Amino acid sequence: MELLCIDSKEKVKISEKIFGQKFNESLVHQVVRSYRITKRQGTSAQKSRSEVIGSGKKPWRQKGTGRARAGSVKSPIWRSGGVTFAKKTRDFKHKINKKMYKNALKSIFSELCRQNRILIVKNFFVKSEKTKLLKKKLNEMNLENVLIISKTIDKNLVLSSRNLNKVHVCFPININPINLISFKKTIITIDAIKIIEEILT
């Protein structure tokens, strides 16, 4: 397979095993769902009546006071009492093996390639850390919502992109399915393509 490099106007060979696979929707859905679930904190917790601090003594006698009967100050119907079905901390980790994860990334890259959402460049940098310079460069390329994958990330590029919520810069080793499907276009440097091919083969 070959793609045209935007800045040098030369054709770049890319692996068909990574950028020319059939789109496996069910696998991508499974991996994306697993990735999102794993990111959940699961730290929400409440106290049940057995965990609330308080006396175990009956507040008043059963009969003769005129008030409703009560057996504990820790009852869920009392103020400051325990919660009936108290939430507990949970581990939301959902395991996906490496082969499935790699195949999902290959499938996503292939679909992006088919939809002409991948742009190849020799290098991508800005002269200063000013956001307006990066925005101007992207406007010249007719880009707004973009993921930039580069082998060597320029400090100016990182600093200038931080203020743009629709622009994300990352190393090839840090790519994940959420990033790949979240942006309309993906800019990849030639050096980064080689690393991606090494990682996914």
UniProtKB/Swiss-Prot annotation:
The gene is rplD. One of the primary rRNA binding proteins, this protein initially binds near the 5'-end of the 23S rRNA. It is important during the early stages of 50S assembly. It makes multiple contacts with different domains of the 23S rRNA in the assembled 50S subunit and ribosome. Pfam families: Ribosomal_L4. One of its GO terms (biological process) is translation. Belongs to the universal ribosomal protein uL4 family. The lineage of its organism: Bacteria, Pseudomonadati, Pseudomonadota, Gammaproteobacteria, Enterobacterales. It comes from Wigglesworthia glossinidia brevipalpis. Part of the 50S ribosomal subunit. Residues 39-72 are annotated as: Disordered. One of its GO terms (cellular component) is ribonucleoprotein complex. This is Large ribosomal subunit protein uL4. Keywords: Ribonucleoprotein, Ribosomal protein, RNA-binding, rRNA-binding.
